[in-house]
């Protein structure tokens, strides 16, 4: 006797189901991982979302919670497992796993604790999705993106750190608030390390093509009577402030990662300040990952924009690179 399903549906296509075309995997279902997952889902960027974590109950709970919202989403398949086979055929893999930054702890203090975790994670990802683009979010993100590149064996253009995409977004928000305009109408970049040695590019800051440095040649310096450099200090302090108030940061980084994911999946060729291999640029001679304005597309980092930086800004970038190299050179087992 025919089942309800057999009576209801007449199949036409035969053979195996089509593999996913825009599968996104999130490794780590903590606060940041789930903010990334929800942001990707709400922007309708994936035809399959996979979640991976070592804490099985939490992982299953998050999967079920998202699946129960399927009616309100456009992602037909949401899966989760601690086994990395669930991530197979991913286009984008977002790595948020790692130990969390503590209040007052600098991002660079986190590094060796997270390196040991990555030695398990990264080879598993590449085993099941050898053609993926890896987006590293875990802190300290620049060093861990370098670690990911070394452990993965992937070409450098397919290993990206979320870098200063969020720092730049914070900068644009803070500056725009001071100017009474929307964040998208203030153009400015934070480059270098995602963290304490980040570099504000005051020479390029503008609104509608009007250079702020031309209006105020001292902008961003100690001589500036208007003290605009306070905006960059607020960017550097912002994560620490949010962590102090609520224990972690997650929503802004989740939105930032979804923004990057959209550019990669849709082959948009948009420019984002993300962490990439900078050896040979701006006089940097070491293999370090730092944020520069990168053209992102379906290949990963398609190219890097050569910004016209001042000597002071280039000096700050080199200093940022030196800070990171000081950590990297002591890493073990890479």
Swiss-Prot record:
It is found in: Cytoplasm. InterPro entries: L-lactate/malate_DH, L-lactate_DH, L-lactate_DH_AS, Lactate/malate_DH_C, Lactate/malate_DH_N, Lactate_DH/Glyco_Ohase_4_C, NAD(P)-bd_dom_sf. Pfam families: Ldh_1_C, Ldh_1_N. Pathway: Fermentation; pyruvate fermentation to lactate; (S)-lactate from pyruvate: step 1/1. Its EC number is 1.1.1.27. One of its GO terms (biological process) is pyruvate metabolic process. The active site is at 194 (proton acceptor). It comes from the Eukaryota. Its main location: cytoplasm. GO terms for cellular component: mitochondrion. The keyword Aminoacyl-tRNA synthetase does not apply. Substrate binds at residues 107, 139, 170, 249. It is an enzyme of class 1 (oxidoreductase). NAD(+) binds at residues 30-58, 100, 139. It catalyses: (S)-lactate + NAD(+) = pyruvate + NADH + H(+). Keywords: Cytoplasm, NAD, Oxidoreductase. Belongs to the LDH/MDH superfamily. LDH family. Homotetramer. This is L-lactate dehydrogenase B-A chain. It comes from Danio rerio (Zebrafish).
């Amino acid at each position: 006797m025919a089942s309800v399903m057999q009576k209801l549906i007449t199949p036409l296509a035969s053979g195996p189901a089509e593999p996913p075309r825009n599968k996104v995997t999130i490794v780590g279902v903590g606060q940041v991982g789930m903010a990334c997952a929800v942001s990707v889902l709400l922007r309708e960027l994936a035809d399959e979302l996979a979640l991976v974590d070592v804490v099985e109950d939490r992982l299953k709970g998050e999967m079920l919670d998202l699946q129960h919202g399927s009616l309100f989403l456009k992602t037909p398949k949401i899966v989760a497992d601690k086994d990395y086979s669930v991530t197979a055929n991913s286009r984008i893999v977002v790595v948020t796993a790692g130990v969390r930054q503590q209040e007052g702890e600098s991002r660079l203090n986190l590094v060796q604790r997270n390196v040991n975790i990555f030695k398990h994670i990264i080879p598993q990802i590449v085993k099941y999705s050898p053609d993926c683009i890896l987006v590293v979010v875990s802190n300290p993100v620049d060093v861990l993106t370098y670690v990911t590149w070394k452990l993965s064996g992937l070409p450098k253009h397919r290993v990206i750190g979320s870098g200063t995409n969020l720092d730049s977004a914070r900068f644009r928000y803070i500056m725009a608030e001071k100017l009474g305009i929307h964040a998208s109408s203030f153009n400015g970049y934070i480059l270098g390390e995602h963290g304490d040695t980040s570099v504000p590019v005051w020479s390029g800051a503008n609104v509608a093509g009007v250079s702020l440095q031309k209006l105020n040649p001292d902008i961003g310096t100690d001589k500036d009577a208007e003290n605009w450099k306070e905006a960059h200090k607020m960017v550097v302090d912002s994560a620490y402030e949010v962590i102090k108030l609520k224990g972690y940061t997650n929503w802004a980084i989740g939105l930032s990662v979804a923004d990057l994911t959209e550019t990669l999946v849709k082959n948009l060729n948009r420019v984002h300040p993300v962490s990439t291999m900078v050896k040979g640029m701006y006089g940097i001679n070491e293999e370090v990952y730092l944020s520069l304005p990168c053209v992102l597309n379906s290949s990963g980092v398609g190219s890097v924009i050569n910004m016209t930086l001042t000597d002071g800004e280039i000096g700050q970038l080199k200093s940022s690179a030196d800070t990171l190299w000081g950590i990297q050179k002591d890493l073990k087992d890479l």
